[in-house]
Amino acid sequence: APFILFVRAKPRIKDFMSEAENHMIEAPEALPQVQNLDEIHPDQNPSAYNESSIQILEGLEAVRKRPGMYIGDTADGSGLHHLVYEVVDNSIDEALAGFATHIEVTIHTDNSVSVVDDGRGIPSAIKWDDKHDPKRSAAEIALTELHAGGKFDNNGYKISGGLHGVGVSCVNALSSWLRLTVRRDGEARFLEFRKGLVQNRIVEQLPNPLTGKLENVSPMKLLGPTNRRGTEVHFLPDLTIFEKVTQFSYDTLLSRLRELSFL
C-alpha cells in the first residue's frame, strides 16, 4: 500500500540559503628544505605524526569533533538539512518494509523539526547483552552508538533504502536537544538527549533473563498506555556546529521529500 508523507511548517520559514563564499589559497613559491629529518624531535615538531597523534573518541565525540565527515558541509545548509533526511530515511524504511503508511515532517517556530511515523517503533526494551553499566534500552543504544541499528542482522529489514550514513545517532550528536518518543506494544516511552547525552537517566535493578542475576538497567521513561504506534523524533540543531545557514528551508525540504515520496 502507498504511504503518505506530509511536510508542514509552523509558520512557513523563508529560505535563507545563500551560496558559500569561495576562498582561494595561494601556494608558496617554494617549500622549505629540511636537511636532516632525524634532527627534528617529534615533540618539537608541531606537524609530527606519531603514537601521540592517535586519538580514541568515545560514543558520539567523533561526530561532534568532525561533523563534516558524517553529514557534509556545515556552512552551506546541506549538512543542516541532511539531519532531517537521516531521520526521514528511517521512517521510509519502515514504509518500504510494509509497516508504516504515514510520515509527517514539521518545521516548528523555534527551528526544531519533528518526524513522526506510524511504523513499528524503535525497540524500547532493555538490551540485556549490552556491555554498558547500567544496561540501556535498545532505543538509547541506537541513538548514542554510531554503528548500532536494526539493519545489520538481515532480519529487521528485508527491504531497505540502505544504511543512510550513520543514521539518527548522528542527528542526536549534532542537536542541542533531541526528544524521542516510541509508541510500541501499547506503551509510550520517552528519552531526552542534549548534545548526544541522555538526560534524567532512570536507573533501577531488574533480574537479567539471560543470567538470573540482578543488574542495573536504564529503561526509557514510561509515559503511559497508547493505542498508537510508531516513532517520533523531535530535535533542535546545535548552532555551535552549523555556521552560516542555520534556518531550515521549507522549499528545500519540500523538494527533497516530494522526490522521496515517489520512490
What are these regions (language model features)?
Residues T101-I107:
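A conserved short beta-strand within the histidine kinase catalytic ATPase domain
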Residues A1-F16:
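Short, Lys/Arg-enriched N-terminal segments with co-localized hydrophobic residues
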Residues A142:
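Short basic (Lys/Arg) and small-residue
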Residues G77-T101, G167-L174:
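Conserved ATP-binding N-box helix of the HATPase_c
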Residues N50-R64, A75-E86:
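N-terminal amphipathic, basic-rich helices that act as targeting or association modules
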Residues E145-L146:
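Mobile ATP-lid/nucleotide-binding loop of the nucleotide-binding subdomain
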Residues P67-A75, K151-F152:
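Structural recognition of short helix-loop-helix hairpins that underlie histone-fold modules
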Residues F16-S53, N111-A138, G149-L263:
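GHKL-type ATPase core
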